[in-house]
Amino acid sequence: MPKILVVDDEVGIRELLFEILRDEGHDVQLAENAAAARAAREAGRPDLVLLDIWMPDTDGITLLKEWSGNGQLNMPVVMMSGHATIDTAVEATRIGALDFLEKPIGMQKLLG
C-alpha cells in the first residue's frame, strides 16, 4: 500500500485528501506545516508527497529546495496551490517537483 504524505496548512484540504486517498487504499500521513513534514519525512520516506506551496513559516517551494539540497528528494513530490502562478509551477518543476495540481482538488484531478 503506497504511503502518501499530504502537507497543507488548511485542515479542510488535508481532511478531503485524506478521505479520498484512504478510500483508494493508500496509507496517508498528514502534516500541517513544513516542520511536521520534515518530521514525517525523517520517520520514513513516503512514496509520494502532496505539498502545498503557500504555507505559513516555511513555504512549499522552500521545503522542496531544502529536500533537494539535502539529498532527500528521492520521492515524487506534487505541488498544490490555489494561488500559484505559472512561474511558481515552473520553478517547482525545475527544483524537482513531479507535477503541479491547482486547487480546488477534486477526486478526478487527484486520481487521474
Regions found by a protein language model. Name each.
Residues D87, P104-G112:
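C-terminal output helix
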Residues E10, I53-W54, M79:
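The short loop immediately C-terminal to the conserved phospho-acceptor aspartate in CheY-like receiver
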